[in-house]
Each structure stands twice: as structure tokens, then as C-alpha cells.
């Protein structure tokens, strides 16, 4: 059996969400598990968060359906909203699906479906959040449309408007002028909304960690919940977070190189002295980035070392000159507790988000719960 695998530590996940809950103080957490929980496995993560997060957030309705069909009953916030009236109509078979309204055309779709929902208990009504564009200019309504959209939505007897939200573009930067402008714009939106009983949500992971004034009623932690940092100059450990994913494999060969010997495709690395190298059974076919630079950190037998040579589809090579105990079968950590995903990502000119979500189906996820493999 190929040795590459991703260990998903559900105890670390619970540690992180509890830490984030404590930072959020009185705000509640809508835990973001879109994109298969950032590559960690959405169903398993959702189950582990039961009792820890009162709401889960996904990108699209398909992700919501997968969770409901797996028996997950936690309320689900669909961040991209609905794409069609057909999606809306189909969603009537589920309870506690919360939609984001971010575009005027969505009102026409709602007008076809919302009247079919009768006024009743909150769990049976179609629930919506209004998204305000405060400067990211991706999704969201302008402030001057807020009153009109709110009035239209409230005309549907089977629909409840439950909140106003926005999304920050530069919350990972301290003293960002755009962050300040977006926050002021959202404050204006809250003031315009008035005393209507709505909830308010603006903080992603970065804002949760750096801008406490933005916490409001609901925070939406994503990457931080998985133990990585949204800030380029910090790691998850700097905030007391624990890595949830450990990506590991094993050595399948070792070799002694002489000065002048090169390794792999393109002869991208040449030894300038005698070097003992190891071949690891992992590559870009597993999601380890091909663009990873020479010198990227890994750990062999728990000791830090570096990649040498180009990453292949199924293999990569590492320097084990200073690890005499390394041999075929020795464990290799690509990222995890010894080598952080935040650090590794920098050597590929990317971010930890892409490392996690880019892991392919060839890599089995193995879950650890209460310190036991499940």
C-alpha cells in the first residue's frame, strides 16, 4: 500500500475552535467547511464540530446537500447563495439552510419559490442573509440597495431575513486603509438596517484574530480552524493553533551521491559535495506542488531537512546526509507539527489554503479522534 496519507487530528480541530470561540468572546462561530473542509473532509469535520460550532458555512448548495445526505443536521450557511430558482425549490426539502442574497437578480428567483413556503416556525421558513459589498467588489449589494432589498424580502410570508454580512479583502494586514474603509461601510450598513433583530457578521479568520471590533454576532473562521495562519508573517502556532492535517509519506530508496551528480528531471539540483539522499513516495500527483523550490523544509525521522531536486508526479528527493538512521520505510512529514504548512507554502509562492485544498483523492485521509485512529 502506498505510504502517502493525510492524518486529520480531530482533537486539534476541537482545540482550535475552542480557542477561536474564546477569542471571539460573545460572538458565535459559523465554522467554514467549504471545499471539503479545506481538503480535510467536510462530513467528518462537520461531525467533529457538533456541539462546538452552532452553524457551519459552505460555498454552494451542492456542498450543503452532501452534508444533509450524510446526516449532518447543524444549520448551514450557503456563502455563494443560490444560482437558480431550481436550487431554491429543491432546498425546501431540508431544514435550516441559510441563503446569502448578494445580487438583485436573486430577487426574481426568490419570487418564484419563496411564496411556496408558508409562514411557520423559523426552521421551516426560507432563511436569508443580505450580503453588503463594502469594498471587496466580489459579491454583495451596494448600500443604496439595502433598504429596497430588505423590504422586498420581507414581503414573502415564507421567508425570514436573519442577518447582514460582508467580507473583508485585507483583514490579514494590520492598519490596512481598505480594511478601515470596509469596516466603516459595514457600520453604515448596520445603522441603515436599524433595530430589526438581525444578526451581523463580518469577521473571517484574519479579522477574528486581528480586529476584535469586527466580531459582532457571528464570526466565520476558516483557515485558522485548521491550524494555519491567514497572515503571511505568522504561523498558526503563533496564535496557539494546532495543525489539524499532517501530510506524511515514507522513504522508498536511499542513494549516495558524489560531487557533481544531479537529481531528477532537468537536473535541477547538483551536489557540490558527497550527499546522502532519500526518495519519498509523494509528488504533484498527490497534491504536493511541483513548483516547490529547492530547500523547502520537510522532516525525516522527526528531523528537519530539505528537498533537493524537482518534484515529480509520484516522488520527490530529500537530503538525509545528517540523518544516519534514515532508511527505506522511514517516516517523512511534508507538513504538520514539525514543519508548518504556512512555512512550506512560502517555498511554493502560495498559501496554506492551496496546499490543503490541492491534495488529491489519491491521498487517503486518516482520522484521529480522542488520540485514536478511527
UniProtKB/Swiss-Prot annotation:
Cofactor(s) annotated in UniProt: pyridoxal 5'-phosphate
Binding site for substrate: 138, 313
EC number of this enzyme: 5.1.1.1
GO terms, biological process: D-alanine biosynthetic process
InterPro entries reported in the protein's UniProt record: Ala_racemase (IPR000821), Ala_racemase/Decarboxylase_C (IPR009006), Ala_racemase_C (IPR011079), Ala_racemase_N (IPR001608), Ala_racemase_pyridoxalP-BS (IPR020622), PLP-binding_barrel (IPR029066)
Lineage: Bacteria, Pseudomonadati, Pseudomonadota, Gammaproteobacteria, Oceanospirillales
UniProt-recorded name of the protein: Alanine racemase
N6-(pyridoxal phosphate)lysine, modified sites: 34
Gene, per the UniProt record: alr
Swiss-Prot/TrEMBL catalytic activity: L-alanine = D-alanine
GO MF terms held by the record: alanine racemase activity; pyridoxal phosphate binding
Amino acid at each position: 500500500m502506498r505510504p502517502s496519507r493525510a492524518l486529520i487530528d480531530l482533537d486539534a480541530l476541537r482545540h482550535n475552535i475552542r480557542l477561536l470561540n474564546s477569542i471571539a468572546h460573545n460572538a458565535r462561530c459559523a465554522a467554514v467547511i467549504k471545499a471539503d473542509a479545506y481538503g480535510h473532509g467536510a462530513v467528518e469535520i462537520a461531525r467533529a464540530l457538533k456541539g462546538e460550532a452552532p452553524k457551519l458555512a459552505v460555498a454552494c448548495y451542492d456542498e450543503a446537500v452532501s452534508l444533509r445526505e450524510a446526516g449532518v443536521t447543524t444549520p448551514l450557511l450557503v456563502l455563494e447563495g443560490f444560482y437558480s430558482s431550481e436550487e431554491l425549490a429543491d432546498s425546501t426539502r431540508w431544514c435550516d439552510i441559510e441563503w446569502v442574497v448578494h445580487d438583485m437578480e436573486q430577487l426574481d428567483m426568490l419570487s418564484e419559490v419563496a411564496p411556496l413556503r408558508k409562514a411557520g416556525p423559523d426552521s421551516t421558513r426560507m432563511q436569508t442573509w443580505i450580503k453588503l459589498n463594502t469594498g471587496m467588489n466580489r459579491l454583495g449589494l451596494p448600500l443604496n440597495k439595502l433598504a429596497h432589498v430588505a423590504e422586498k424580502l420581507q414581503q414573502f410570508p415564507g421567508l425570514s431575513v436573519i442577518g447582514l454580512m460582508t467580507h473583508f479583502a485585507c483583514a490579514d494586514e494590520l492598519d490596512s486603509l481598505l480594511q478601515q474603509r470596509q469596516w466603516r461601510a459595514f457600520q453604515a450598513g448596520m445603522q441603515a438596517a436599524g433595530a430589526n433583530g438581525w444578526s451581523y457578521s463580518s469577521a473571517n479568520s484574519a479579522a477574528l484574530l486581528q480586529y476584535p471590533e469586527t466580531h459582532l454576532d457571528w464570526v466565520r473562521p476558516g483557515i485558522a480552524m485548521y491550524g494555519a495562519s491567514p497572515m503571511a508573517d505568522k504561523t498558526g502556532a503563533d496564535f496557539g493553533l494546532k495543525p489539524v492535517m499532517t501530510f506524511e509519506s515514507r522513504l522508498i530508496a536511499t542513494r549516495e551521491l558524489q560531487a557533481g551528480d544531479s537529481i531528477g528531471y532537468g537536473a535541477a539540483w547538483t551536489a557540490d559535495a558527497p550527499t546522502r539522499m532519500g526518495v519519498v513516495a509523494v509528488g504533484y500527483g498527490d497534491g504536493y506542488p511541483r513548483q516547490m523550490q529547492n530547500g523547502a523544509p520537510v522532516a525525516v525521522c522527526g528531523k528537519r531537512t530539505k528537498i533537493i531536486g524537482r518534484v515529480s508526479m509520484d516522488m520527490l528527493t530529500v537530503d538525509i546526509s545528517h540523518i544516519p538512521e534514515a532508511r527505506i520505510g522511514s517516516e517523512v512529514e511534508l507538513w504538520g507539527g514539525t514543519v508548518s504548512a504556512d512555512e512550506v507554502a512560502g517555498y511554493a509562492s502560495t498559501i496554506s489554503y492551496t496546499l490543503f485544498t490541492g491534495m488529491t483523492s489519491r491521498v487517503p485521509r486518516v482520522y484521529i479522534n480522542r488520540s485514536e485512529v478511527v
